[in-house]
Curated annotation (Swiss-Prot):
<dbReference type="Pfam" id="PF07378">
    <property type="entry name" value="FlbT"/>
</dbReference>
<comment type="function">
    <text>Has a post-transcriptional repressor function in flagellum biogenesis. Associates with the 5'-UTR of fljK mRNA and promotes its degradation.</text>
</comment>
<dbReference type="GO" id="GO:0044781">
    <property type="term" value="P:bacterial-type flagellum organization"/>
</dbReference>
<keyword id="KW-1005">Bacterial flagellum biogenesis</keyword>
<keyword id="KW-0694">RNA-binding</keyword>
<dbReference type="GO" id="GO:1902209">
    <property type="term" value="P:negative regulation of bacterial-type flagellum assembly"/>
</dbReference>
<dbReference type="GO" id="GO:0048027">
    <property type="term" value="F:mRNA 5'-UTR binding"/>
</dbReference>
<dbReference type="GO" id="GO:0006402">
    <property type="term" value="P:mRNA catabolic process"/>
</dbReference>
<keyword id="KW-0678">Repressor</keyword>
<protein>
    <recommendedName>
        <fullName>Probable flagellum biosynthesis repressor protein FlbT</fullName>
    </recommendedName>
</protein>
<comment type="similarity">
    <text>Belongs to the FlbT family.</text>
</comment>
<dbReference type="InterPro" id="IPR009967">
    <property type="entry name" value="Flagellum_FlbT"/>
</dbReference>
């Protein structure tokens, strides 16, 4: 079953190695295949990955977009070790994220991390 994607005017999306920018009207299209897909709002850059959880998210994002877990594995393991030592309450989510990575479900790993980014922001704002 194809993935249905609706883009707002000028919204961008990454499909595989390509960035697609929508024109000035709302657009809907269907995507068949297994290329990595991320909406602009879900993409972090090196500049925006400025917290421990965001660095982990960026690492998993690169695994996903480049389809290369081993290239980022050591970096990921270092980041999660530091995070769990600093915030033990994040362990359960990090374990679930790691299980998704181990089973090759990188998009699910990213989805698992998104609420953790919000929790981290709440902790940092105190």
């Amino acid at each position: 079953m194809p993935l249905r994607v609706e883009l707002k005017p000028f919204e961008r999306i990454v499909i595989g190695q390509s960035v697609i920018t929508n024109s000035d009207t709302r657009t809907t299209f269907l995507i068949d295949g297994d290329a990595p897909i991320l909406r602009e709002k879900d993409i972090l850059t090196a500049e925006t990955a400025n917290t421990p959880v965001k660095r982990i998210y960026l690492c998993v994002q690169m695994m996903y977009l480049q389809n290369d877990i081993p290239a980022y594995q050591d970096l990921y393991l270092g980041f999660i070790k530091e995070l769990i030592e600093a915030v033990p309450s994040f362990r359960e989510t990090i374990e679930a994220t790691s299980n998704h990575i181990l089973s090759g479900n990188l998009y699910k790993a990213l989805r698992e991390l998104r609420p953790l980014i919000k929790r981290e922001e709440e902790l940092l704002s105190r």
